[in-house]
Amino acid sequence: MELKGSRTEQNLLNAFSGESMARNKYLFFAEKAKQENHPEVAELFEKMAQNEGMHGKLLYHYLKGVGGTAENLREAVDGEYGEWSRMYPEFARIAREEGFEAIGKLFDEITKIER
């Protein structure tokens, strides 16, 4: 059976996205806990982030897997180019169109950083 185009592939993508977002969120929470002098809570969030990262790695294996360094560099360059040349400028335009000027500016700033 072919994974490409299957509901299972979509579930893998959704799960990978969720695990990736949770990992970042927990790292943000850990940083805040450190700022508020709660090292034990920060450590807990960091462990949770590590676990989410491992879940993401397992899921990614089925989606694409990690290639060789040259292939990984090409994929990274292509992804970053797409973000700053198309995705973020379009997001900025839409944000402004909908009246979210501050978010439009955020997308513009991210565009500059991504370049």
Predicted regions and their residues:
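Non-heme di-metal
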Residues: 1-115
